[in-house]
Amino acid sequence: MSNSSCADEDLIIRFDSLNQKAAQFVYLLAIILTFITTYFAVKILFTQSFFEISTKILLVQNLFYANLYQFFHGIEAVRMLYKSFFMINDPCNFMEPEIECVFYYKIILMGSSGMVYGQTGLLIERLCATFSKDYKKKQSAIKCAVISILVLICSSSTGRLIVWDDPIDKYNFACYIPPKESYIRANHYFTMCAVLSTINFCISTFILKYNKRCEYQTRFKVGARFQKQELIESTKAICFLTVSQFVAVFLNSFGMIVLVYIQESISHRIFNLLVVWLYAFPIVVLMFPVILVHQIRSSRWRRALKIKVIKNEKQTQDDHMKHMKNMWI
């Protein structure tokens, strides 16, 4: 962030480095792969998964936010590569006016916040499915609509709230950087996202543990057990997806926090070398459709295996009670 449109020497050195250029190319590759894997994820989601329609819609909404973020971050990556190759000798036209960046910044925040809020929405939907005794299509459709609208409203408002009263009269080297006067609120937002991701992780762990204990409650009712197994497998896939995203975001955020903390103790060269790789959010976003595809295929395999076990299993009442006792130990 700067009051001048001219870049300082450290920024020019950073953009001129092979490390910076390589990182932007890797980001672009991750962005392109996100678009490709999203196509396969949506196709598999509607042709091979046994998720409820409400879960499918919320997953598609999350994929939309992921691709929205990647698209606009890709525009920034191309801009930064252009500067690295063609504007190094023109430092006074290097910086971007905040007034021209604010639209991109709001959209990028809409994408990133939409993914976090969307994960929370998915877990709320799974909580309803897990604890509702009669989770019919009509009920799931209503809950899905409410969650989707809330996620849309919150994600659309995030960027506007952060830059609410910012004069937006400074300069930045990239449009995904928050405006100078909004920097503190942007940090509060990222802290909120970290807390919300942690809450999502705790909810996912609770649901997984609860479903594990409830898995054998319908041991002697094959039809009910089959339906329960479908619910457990779909919920397990969503929870694993959330846990994986939490781990990725946590490592990314923790790395950035450590780097900022030791910034004064290391040289500009080392800082510039590390920061572009620790801020690798396009790679984190790529993981979402990839893990989704993996989870759909894995859940189908586990479901088929469980059906086979249910059909072939012959268990006495004593065996069942022993297994139930072990589950609660």
From Swiss-Prot:
GO CC field: membrane
InterPro entries: 7TM_GPCR_serpentine_rcpt_Sra (IPR000344), Nematode_rcpt-like_serp_alpha (IPR051080)
One Gene Ontology MF term: olfactory receptor activity
Main location: membrane
Keywords associated with the record: Membrane, Transmembrane, Transmembrane helix
Transmembrane segments: 25-45, 57-77, 104-124, 144-164, 188-208, 240-260, 273-293
Phosphoprotein as UniProt keyword: no
Entry-linked Pfam families: 7TM_GPCR_Sra
Entry's Gene Ontology BP terms: detection of chemical stimulus involved in sensory perception
Compartment(s) of residence: Membrane
Topological relation to the membrane, as annotated: Multi-pass membrane protein
PANTHER family attached to this UniProt entry: SERPENTINE RECEPTOR CLASS ALPHA-1-RELATED, SERPENTINE RECEPTOR CLASS ALPHA-10
Family statement: Belongs to the nematode receptor-like protein sra family.
Protein name: Serpentine receptor class alpha-2
